[in-house]
Amino acid sequence: MNQGVACESDLLVVKMGIPRENSFPRTTELIQGIDYLVRQALAMGRPMVINLSFGNNYGSHKGDSLLETYIDMVSSTGRLAICTGTGNNGNQPLHEGGTLKQGQTRQIELSVSSREPTLNVQLWKSYEDEMSIYIENPSGNRIGPLDEKLGPQRYRLGNTELLIYYGKPGPYHLTQEIYIDFLPVETYVDSGDWKIILSGKRVRGGEYYLWLPGGNTLNRGTGFYEPRAYGTLTIPATARRVITVGAYDSLVDSYADFSGRGSRMLPYLKPDLVAPGVNIVAPVPGGGYRTVTGTSFATPFVSGSAALLMQWGIVNGNDPYLYGEKVKAYLRKGARPLTGYEEYPNEEVGWGEDVIIRLH
């Protein structure tokens, strides 16, 4: 018989809304779903573990997005633990970045495959750094330097229209986003090698990071030529107070290369730990089971472990304060190192494997 880690738990399931074509549910819908769960837990007077098998690439990946700020805030409300996956972008060419010095030029190459209906690029940098930005299409035609001004800027290169938005720092972050939308004049974006050129004008820190959308929204072959594997966590996995879960292959006791990786851009280390995420037997709608792979299926293992800890502590009266960061600390301390790593914790598997799942 197949059963989960905390198989006798009561489930409260929330549908986030209907995804639009080639898109995800809105961030506001996820916030509304979490808010509903938190209010229900408070009304019932019961501890709760929230499992978020959800993530996207939109944001600075520094834990300062609206969603992550909200999650960190609500984590201190009631007796909660929130678990989320690292995403499956670890082996995808969706992230680039580096450091630009004053007077230097950096060229980021982006391959766009044929029949790509649309795509976008986020460029994040420190607001204090001033950089000239140019964009070159596969035919060698170039626009730039772009004007830093409010409102959309519209350009045309070949059969592709570019919409460019310069962001500003916000109440919760110091960073600046330059959002570049590639739209077809007819049916598809011009395929081939695009270039984004950065030139340092007045630079203090110089770090810059770029992301393409994940979630299999792009055609195979579209991506950066020199991608970075570190910094591929999806959002909200970079939130400070969530329990961030990566995936490993339990059959060979090794890290799953698709699992998103943390990076030094965060002031704290992520992920927190890993759980089995390769060839997992899971139920399907209508009855029956099938095997699935991904961090969305690793996360529920840890959510179940958190639920068992909170049952032992809160429900059984052994520790009424066993929730939130305390649950994370217990899971980290008990984690088992995987083979092949000398340094722990690290940006691939965190503190190691969740061991509670081995007890059930």
Residue ranges and their predicted role:
Residues I178, R204-G215:
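Edge beta-strands of jelly-roll/beta-sandwich modules across compartments, strongly enriched
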Residues D190-W194:
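A glycine-anchored, Pro-Gly-centered beta-turn/N-cap motif
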Residues M1-N2, L12-R20, Q40-M44, E130-S132, ...:
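Hydrolase catalytic cores
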Residues V49-I50, L67-G97, G350-R358:
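Catalytic cores of secreted or luminal carbohydrate-active enzymes
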Residues Q92-Y179, L183, Y188, L198-S199, ...:
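Extracellular S/T/G-rich loop segment that most often corresponds to the catalytic His/Ser-adjacent loop
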Residues V14-M16, I34-K62, G85-T86, S199-K201:
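Short acidic, glycine-rich surface-loop motifs adjacent to enzyme active sites
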Residues G4, D10-K15, M48-L52, A81-G85, ...:
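Structural recognition of the beta-strand scaffold that forms the well-ordered cores
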Residues Q32-S53, T339-H360:
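C-terminal domain-closing interface element
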